[in-house]
């Protein structure tokens, strides 16, 4: 064993191995390994492990079952170092007789002490070849504060800043399994409220297998506890409208939406899952006619389109009159979309005036919240980046990190009541090992969070007295018990009720279906 120093770090270079069977199809010889001798608890660090292909089969890249990847051993498939595998990488092949160096970031455990570090190759038949030497790495105690301090903004003008504890869970209900040609299983729903002579309804937009807008009743609520949906009632379909599609039939609704009763207009949004081209029709409007038909009314491109792909909402009149010159439509919600440079690295929101149906572009947006390139929203540090080159800042601790390429925001609500205020962005954050593996973004796990922002600070951004990236959430709260990703939320200011739709919230046969959870704001 030879002690080396690389980039100022103390490393162990191991050049020994164990005997392997000759002439096997899959076989490998250990060559060398570079791993820090000592790391701090929770530290993210880089390793290099070189193996030689001594078998007869070429090691090809792995996409489905991870052949020719390194797997943790002692014991097998342990996740002491944040993950149990290190991939070979996209576009790589290792012919017989050739060496290959596996490079990855790993994460130290939280517990101080000596921990075993050992790996072995894995292919279609299973583990094969020599293991790396059984090395002990010392993990030292991390010094510093355990959690960031939460400071709730002071009340002003009789309005307190809302926190997670202000929301009292009232109950939940199911979404209809089908409506027209829409199915609940894979749909990324949009949702908004409508007042009718028969009471309140929800508009829901299914996106799979075909887009379908419908109106549903709001049933009696029951509690969703420990994943049990037995007592939950299902909303009843009252009317099926059909597919929301823009005038040139090049975009259909797949984001958020908001209903304008006075104009009988549904404003809805569109985003593209993988887009490198020019402007797309982010905002669209469809008139719902009294005879049950729909008329495509307007379609608009907008500046900073990837900041605004998530959805559309209506701002409270009190806020719009004070800060945005009366502009009361808002587009958002930010976070990751493919090709990230133009995206907001965190929640985003901008105000616009109701657009002219004859115009094809919104020319003026009033930014309220967003994180341009070079800035980022905060997030918990319960993750690490294994191999990606964008939005890849490693966390400083288990509690402190920066928005990553596995973090999404598809819904938000703006609340301005007589006694309380706040903007809430609903974010899905990747956890554990995050990777860009064979052209696919992956994460070991995910958690849903509520981000609470002071609307007065958003107003300061609108007035150009504050940069949007300087607005930070005063509370980031994990919502652990409700399952699934939030794709829609709407606030009923008359009844002080918040409706939150989470897709894939419970198992329904071979599919996962959504639930709507309802919360009352405490007085």
Report the location of each language-model feature.
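Beta-strand-rich interaction surfaces with strong enrichment in secreted/lumenal proteins
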Residues: 35-37, 86-94, 105-107
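Short, surface-exposed loop/turn segments at beta-strand-coil junctions that are enriched for proline
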Residues: 107-113
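Asparagine-centered strand-capping/turn motif at beta-strand->loop junctions
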Residues: 51-55
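Low-complexity, acidic Ser/Thr/Pro/Gly-rich terminal tails and inter-domain linkers that flank the onset
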Residues: 21-39
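Short beta-strand and strand-turn-strand segments in soluble, beta-rich domains
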Residues: 27-30, 73-89
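Short acidic, flexible loop segments centered on an aromatic residue
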Residues: 56-79, 121-122
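Beta-sandwich strand segments
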Residues: 125-133
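Sequence/structural signature of beta-propeller domains
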Residues: 148-523
